[in-house]
Amino acid sequence: MELKHSISDYTEAEFLQLVTTICNADTSSEEELVKLVTHFEEMTEHPSGSDLIYYPKEGDDDSPSGIVNTVKQWRAANGKSGFKQG
């Protein structure tokens, strides 16, 4: 999986693939998973970081698409760039 430099370099579908890979722990090693989680935290800039995945708030949609929607809504509400169109 190619890691991009900015969340705006990802389409929503590409970012969903990243989140799905993390949620399913579909990596060849623990080291690779940690790298993806760190990348998720850096790209989203969300104050909850990886807790969105591993320790979601009660009632939150903790599916990969729910996590992506949470990130998208938070970034929009905080004046941050969104996903690349396409």
Swiss-Prot record:
CDD domains: Col_Im_like. It comes from the Bacteria. Pfam families: Colicin_Pyocin (PF01320). InterPro entries: Colicin_E_sf, Colicin_pyocin. One of its GO terms (cellular component) is protein-containing complex. Keywords: Bacteriocin immunity, Plasmid. Transmembrane segments: none annotated. GO terms for molecular function: protein domain specific binding; toxic substance binding. Coiled coil: none annotated. GO terms for biological process: bacteriocin immunity. Belongs to the colicins ColE2/ColE8/ColE9 and pyocins S1/S2 family. This protein is able to protect a cell, which harbors the plasmid ColE9 encoding colicin E9, against colicin E9, it binds specifically to the DNase-type colicin and inhibits its bactericidal activity. This is Colicin-E9 immunity protein. It comes from Escherichia coli.
